[in-house]
Amino acid sequence: QNYRNYFDKQTGFMRGKLSATEWRTPFSPFVSRHMKDDFTEGNAWQYTWLVPQDVEGLIALQGGDQPFTQKLDSLFIAKGDMGSEASPDISGLIGQYAHGNEPSHHIAYLYAYAGQPWKTAEKVRYIMDNFYTTKPDGIIGNEDVGQMSAWYVLSAVGIYEVNPANGTFVFGSPAINEAIVRLPKGKQFHIVVKNNSAKHIYIGAISLNGKPYTHDFIRYSDIMSGGSLTIYMTDKPGNFGTLPADRPHSVF
């Protein structure tokens, strides 16, 4: 939880320090100086969210669910000059969100932790539709050991690991209608998506192995056990996954 020491409550951003009590100045959440600044290939707008190990703590640090989601909303529309020394890897921009660089990849899924999974669905589907093609230059940024493609594969199936260390996948907005995950010892995990379309981007309900499932996440252990997951899509945001007990958690 050392990240808390770098959160400036006055500006609402993570920022660099000269000492335990002194912030580095001048400061702009937009500016990025490649290899010369406190952020690598990014700025404070992008790196403030890089706390996958304690999303609940980050939400509390920002004042709760509503201020947290309002800040996320602002991220996707904020406009500002990153400066002439910004890395070219900061690409695929939606406001200050940079899908072309991996530190941003989990951000669209953070809405689910604060009870607004429909915004995760909207952002994830937009990114898949607009930042990936089948052309030779079909990815929006640096592939970096396959992460740009891995984000798409997981998101297209409808899940994503915000915290890879805690064994859970957050639901998003599946782009395909069926997937089979082949597992050891002849097992398989079968994902079927019903009523999916360009307009039906929101998850309305889910069943796991034929039983109603209300959580907005699925555990790795459930997938590895084999079975079936059916996702029912709708064209309007609903209440699926919004209750505190059904939201994903970064710490279990």
Can you describe what each PLM-predicted range is?
Residues 210-219:
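Solvent-exposed beta-strand/loop surfaces of large extracellular or lumenal domains
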Residues 184, 207-211:
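Short strand-turn-strand beta-turns centered on an Asx-Gly dipeptide
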Residues 220-252:
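C-terminal beta-strand-rich structural cap/linker in extracellular carbohydrate-active enzymes
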Residues 1-175, 179-190, 221, 228:
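Active-site core of glycosidic bond-cleaving carbohydrate-active enzymes
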Residues 194-195, 218-222:
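Short proline/glycine-enriched turn/loop segments at secondary-structure junctions
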Residues 201-205:
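Beta-strand-rich binding/interaction modules
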Residues 189-198:
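Short aromatic-glycine motifs in intrinsically disordered, low-complexity regions
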